[in-house]
């Protein structure tokens, strides 16, 4: 279309293509480029004419297969973000699929550092090991 595009890569987003149209407005063209279902952990973008058709192709690099998280459409990695303990700090809690069960990414110790109430509600590792959704943290009083 003759307009320069800005291509963005990042965590938790699709590879995103933005363009400034002739009116000077920023337009999201991600869907037009067929990239609207590419949410991931993107950390690199390069442009190269791979198939020698005269058009630049978008190459994206993301977290590899050796990473702990194995996200698919059926078993996504999920991040819950809120100020769960109302201390004016954002508390991200990530769950991922581990052999068919959703589990918190952070260890009990790491979650206790972030949300100390967890230590009081999950005194034993065995009870914390049963946590497989954000709702399982409801006994802590800050999850709906």
Give the location of each predicted region.
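Acidic, glycine/proline-rich Ca2+-coordinating loop motifs
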Residues: 1-144
């Amino acid at each position: 279309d003759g307009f320069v595009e800005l291509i963005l890569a990042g965590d938790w987003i699709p590879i995103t293509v933005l363009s400034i149209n002739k009116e000077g407005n920023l337009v999201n063209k991600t869907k037009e480029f067929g990239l609207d279902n590419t949410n991931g952990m993107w950390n690199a973008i390069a442009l190269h004419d791979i198939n020698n058709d005269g058009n630049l192709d978008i190459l994206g690099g993301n977290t590899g297969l050796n990473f702990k998280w194995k996200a698919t459409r059926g078993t996504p990695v999920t991040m819950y973000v809120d100020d769960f303990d109302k201390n004016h700090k954002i508390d991200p809690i990530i769950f991922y699929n581990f052999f068919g069960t959703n589990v918190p990414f952070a260890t009990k110790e790491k979650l206790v550092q972030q949300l100390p109430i967890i230590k009081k509600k999950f005194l034993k590792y065995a009870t914390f090991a049963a946590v497989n959704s954000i709702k399982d943290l409801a006994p802590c009083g800050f999850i709906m």
